[in-house]
Amino acid sequence: MLSREDFYMIKQMRQQGAYIVDIATQIGCSERTVRRYLKYPEPPARKTRHKMVKLKPFMDYIDMRLAENVWNSEVIFAEIKAMGYTGGRSMLRYYIQPKRKMRPSKRTVRFETQPRYQLQHDWGEVEVEVAGQRCKVNFAVNTLGFSRRFHVFAAPKQDAEHTYESLVRAFRYFGGCVKTVLVDNQKAAVLKNNNGKVVFNSGFLLLADHYNFLPRACRPRRARTKGKVERMVKYLKENFFVRYRRFDSFTHVNQQLEQWIADVADKRELRQFKETPEQRFALEQEHLQPLPDTDFDTSYFDIRHVSWDSYIEVGGNRYSVPEALCGQPVSIRISLDDELRIYSNEKLVASHRLCSASSGWQTVPEHHAPLWQQVSQVEHRPLSAYEELL
């Protein structure tokens, strides 16, 4: 029998659109069990007794593994199954559960995922010099669970748009997508997480749908769940940002990061595997899900009304729009590299580079050509017509 936590996880994942087979893989049970639990309105009452006949020959081995601090029931299940165990997972869990109180609270079992199964996301921050000024650099780290290969994106903010951009760039860098993305409870991804009942940010759900991954959130105050990526945040602070302290721009930061990953991070030896992330990624890459045809649009979105002189105002400056749109609403998108795109009825009608107000109004002459034609079309009269009035 599954736990109450597993019951609510099944319900939640199904509500978020997960397939039965993916839920079964995540929970560690059969698809038939998932379907049965989806029919229950409430968690079924736990049976008071389990028949341990099938498990009894393996109890000494299980106790030995627990003494070695191996508490992952899936790992133990795979091991005893190879030794001839024919029972189910629930029997093993029932046996392990009362023994968990013996587990030291500060010790954490490392859960090893299969290739392409999971990517862990987290933010870090550090103060360095950019363009001659001391400033805070935020950096998003996206780590593949199997290979430990990671991608880093430095940005001025940790908002939703930069969070999504970091994942877009990571998927492009890896050349494929994963099945699940594990995030902390930042507002860019999670609006509410109440005892496992997660409400995800709608933008993050759109990103998940675009790349066909299942979003997952850490339990509150349980950051160790994504320990792989948190170790990489610490690694960056103690390695890259110790080596490099001055940058020309955020673009320069990202260029240096990419070079450092290729030269240093990808080639470090992972002690538990005796392999490098580069070597393990060679095994994982072929399992990644294919990328969609287009990148997810991470631009800022807003609405503007075109003035009667055929301009819109953005960020304290004015930008021209085709005169036919005077007085009409238009939608705008501002990319993270400051490209302004203007749409009418979802059709691109103008584009500009964002500029400060001191740079002056930004005008495309073709936008206002019809207006100038109207002004120039005045009636021409011979001089004799004016002489007759004298």
UniProtKB/Swiss-Prot annotation:
Q: Which SUPFAM superfamilies match?
A: Ribonuclease H-like (SSF53098)
Alphabetized, the UniProt keywords read: DNA recombination, DNA-binding, Plasmid, Transposable element, Transposition
What are the GO MF terms of this UniProt record? DNA binding
DNA-binding region listed in the record: 20-39
Coiled-coil ranges per UniProt: none
Q: Name one GO biological process term.
A: DNA recombination
Please report the stretch or stretches of sequence annotated as the HTH IS21-type domain: 5-66
- Disulfide-bonded cysteines: none
Question: Sorted alphabetically, which Pfam families does this protein's record hold?
Answer: Mu-transpos_C_2 (PF22483), rve (PF00665)
Entry superkingdom: Bacteria
Known InterPro entries for this protein? HTH_IS21_transposase_type, Integrase_cat-core, IstA-like_C, RNaseH-like_sf, RNaseH_sf
Q: Where's the Integrase catalytic domain? A: 111-285
Q: Does the keyword DNA-binding apply?
A: yes
Which PANTHER family does the record associate with it? INTEGRASE PROTEIN, TRANSPOSASE RV3428C-RELATED
The record's comment on protein family reads: Belongs to the transposase IS21/IS408/IS1162 family.
- What does the UniProt record say this protein does? Involved in the transposition of the insertion sequence.
The entry's protein name is Transposase for insertion sequence element IS21
Source organism per UniProt = Pseudomonas aeruginosa
